[in-house]
Amino acid sequence: MAYKLSLSAVEPLLIFPAAPFSTKKEKSTFQNNLISSDVFSSALKPLSPLKSLVADFSTHSNPSKDNQLISPPKINHREFLNEEKESDTQTRYLKQLINICNSPSKNHETSLSPSKSTIDNNERKLDNEIDNYKHDVKYSPYKGQGKTSNPSQGTTKCPGIFEEDNFFSVSPKRRKNLFEKYGKTDLGKPARVPSPKKSLSSTIKSPPSRVKLPTSILSKSPPLKVPNKNRSSTFSPLRTPTSSSKTFVIVDHSTPSPPSIRTKLEAFAPNSTFATQKRLRRLATLESSPALRSTLKSLQSKSSPVKLLKLKEEKAKIKNQLFKSEEEKDPVGKQKLPLESSLSPLDHSSAEKEMQKAPAKNKRRRTGSLETGLYPKESPTPSKKRSKRVLWSLKHIVSPGNREKHSLNSTPESIMKKDTKWPQNLAKNNINSEPNTPTKSNIDTGKAHSARAHKTRKNIQS
């Protein structure tokens, strides 16, 4: 027995309503209406042969499971709106189906084959709602500032949300904490959560406070209070302030605390324990890196005593080879100089002559000690550029000082003679003799002589 089935008769039964039910009541009423309606019972009769075929197929594949029908896929209202790939014809047809599913009537004929006028009306209603939702959204960030947003500027995929929104002015760290949900940022949520009584989940679910939506689309939850513009971000419930300008925190210095907890007024005094902890932490992070581990291993292997000895031996061999090659190149280098200890002071001149003959390289390498020895090198002809060494060599030419000229008996010219008053007895008897230490008697006589002289001067003046 053949059945003729139209698409309009079958498809409403395979598609569930697109918009999710907000409450359990709505869901149950919708199901009851479907079951009780004539559409549900009458449509199953012609579908009976198809159903049996599906059942046979399911039992053949899985014999343990009894007759099972695959549940039809749910269409999400938002996803359906956001999909841009769908053609206009498809969307219109789906809109009709959603309309029919959401408003089931008891009349079999009207629900399955609605008239053109009803379809057109439903289409217009849906189109108007979507257009209003997308374009005619009023944007008001704060009270008293009523802005109407331009639909051409910054409309996103999510309808009713604009890039001008305050979401973009929030710091990225807070944005991540507040708005990241299932790996995607929900645009349009308020920048600050206003009331601390509400939980975070309820505030995220509620619609944005600054976007005015049509009443048909808005949920029953009350709109959020807009936070005051002048209030700082530290007063938000998510960021509980550790310290404010009015309160003073008493910090216990016995335990080390990071500088972020310390108050502004408190002087920063670094703790030694805190510093060591930081250092240890830094070391741990360094040691964990694989590159540093490899370098440490190589250093440890190098620093072993056996390897160090080997390295020293290799260096010595290389030096000897270089020395031999240099000697072969220049014949002057072969003339070996006698050691410094074996040389007498007279032999130094001959050694110096040999040094002058030898090239600069050998001089530096072999006999560096002779160059800076006891006897400084005296150049026979002083160069134009006068160095310290040249001046030192010419020291013997410089005339000796005044002290060396005079004999030991004569007094030097540089020392000034003191004007001393000698007693008369000494002055008369020994004119040339100068006592080293004057006796007490001499001092007394000197005093008396000076007193007499003073009196005579006074008498003369009078």
Swiss-Prot record:
GO biological-process terms attached to the record: attachment of mitotic spindle microtubules to kinetochore; centromere clustering
PTM note: Phosphorylated by cdk1 at prometaphase arrest. Phosphorylation prevents nsk1 kinetochore and spindle targeting. Dephosphorylated by clp1 at anaphase onset controls its relocalization.
Stretches of the chain forming a coiled coil according to its record: none
Compositionally biased region (Basic and acidic residues): 121-138, 180-189, 324-333
Biased composition range(s): Polar residues: 104-120, 146-156, 229-240, 422-444
Location of the region described as Disordered in the Swiss-Prot/TrEMBL record: 104-161, 180-240, 320-462
Quaternary structure note: Interacts with dlc1. The dlc1-nsk1 complex seems to oligomerize in chain-like structures. Also binds directly to spindle microtubules.
The protein's name in its UniProt record: Kinetochore protein nsk1
Organism: Schizosaccharomyces pombe (strain 972 / ATCC 24843) (Fission yeast)
